[in-house]
UniProtKB/Swiss-Prot annotation:
UniProt feature, compositional bias: Pro residues: 10-22
Transmembrane segments: 25-45, 63-83, 116-138, 188-209, 224-244, 296-319
Organism, as annotated: Danio rerio (Zebrafish)
Classification of source organism: Eukaryota, Metazoa, Chordata, Craniata, Vertebrata
Subcellular location(s) per record: Mitochondrion inner membrane
Gene that this sequence comes from: slc25a34
Name assigned to this protein: Solute carrier family 25 member 34
Length: 319
């Protein structure tokens, strides 16, 4: 594949030399800022994705009314019924989640990359997964509330369980009073595998693709197009691999709980996986695939591009 672009005289792609590390708090802050910036633009697609993934929960295809039939139609339905603000439901919780999760994830990965821990495909995958697991665990309460708020709407277009929170703060207080501290981390057993897989794919693909594009000399070595192309490739890879994990995570987070503070529909990741496949077929794991791709591809592209550019701009001022 390389020869189609580089010819026989092009240098063999290999890992780029590690960048000098930024001050860790700055690195974490830049990761958070980059992903929060991307989140503002892609949150309406996250709302639509959540609704599509909850539609027809544990019901066979054709046995339920499809209120949402695709990305554009779903955006229209939400905008018409809930107003323009409805397209940004859960934005505050989404920004908190992106700031916590991706600040930790990208910041810790950058520190491992600077230390040379990520050299080699397997090492970058493991480092990306570890960074993702850390970020997902810490930020899980924010994702829980985000899912509840984005699923919440008027009865005419409601899908999934409706939690009827008044906002992010009241949701956190309500969940804590009803279920305790553990309730704030309900669904984390679906979030950690989801982000581990997505993070490993995103960071390893982005790093490898950028090295390959730079070494095959598609563009000048300092061109931002190297970063942009690598980010697009990373976004496509993440969208394909992450969708089943995303569906399971959404279901675990949004399910109601019983008087024993246990989920009424699923008791864990594997149970959810088996029940979805049994009731909805394997394709049930790919519900919302289009909005996942439409959201994740630009979100990954924007966040990876912003993160890389911000780090490049910050580097001269920290050394």
């Amino acid at each position: 594949m390389n020869s189609a672009f580089s010819g026989p005289s092009s240098p063999t792609p290999g890992p780029s030399p590690p960048r000098p590390p930024l001050w860790p708090p700055l690195d974490f802050g830049l990761g958070a800022l980059a992903c929060c910036g991307a989140c503002v633009f892609t949150n309406p697609l996250e709302v639509v994705k959540t609704r599509l993934q909850l539609q027809g929960e544990l019901r066979a295809r054709g046995s339920y009314r499809r209120l949402y039939r695709g990305v554009l139609q779903a955006l229209w339905v939400v905008g018409r019924t809930d107003g323009l603000r409805g397209l940004q439901k859960g934005l505050t919780a989404a920004l908190l989640y992106q700031g916590l999760m991706n600040g930790l994830r990208l910041g810790s990965y950058a520190q491992m990359q600077a230390a040379g821990v990520t050299d080699g495909p397997c090492c970058s995958l493991i480092a990306g997964a570890a960074a993702g697991a850390l970020g997902a665990f810490i930020a899980s309460p924010a994702y829980l509330v985000k899912t509840h708020l984005q699923a919440q709407t008027v009865a005419a277009i409601a899908v999934g369980h409706q939690h009827n929170h008044q906002g992010m703060s009241s949701a956190l207080v309500s969940i804590y009073r009803r279920e305790g501290v553990c309730g704030l981390w309900r669904g984390v057993n679906g979030a950690v595998p989801r982000v581990m897989v997505g993070s490993a794919t995103q960071l390893a693909t982005f790093s490898s693709a950028k090295d390959w594009i730079t070494h095959t000399q598609w563009f000048s070595p300092l061109s931002s197009l190297n970063t942009l192309c690598a980010a697009v490739m990373s976004g496509v890879a993440v969208s394909i691999i992450m969708t089943p994990f995303d569906v399971i995570s959404t279901r675990l987070y949004n399910q109601p709980v019983d008087q024993f503070k246990q989920g009424r529909l699923y008791c864990g990741f594997v149970d959810c996986l088996l029940k979805v496949c049994a009731a909805e077929g394997v394709l049930g794991l790919y519900k919302g695939m289009t909005p996942v791709f439409v959201r994740l591809a630009p979100h990954t592209t924007l966040s990876m591009l912003l993160w890389d550019v911000l780090r490049q701009r910050a580097l001269p001022y920290t050394h």
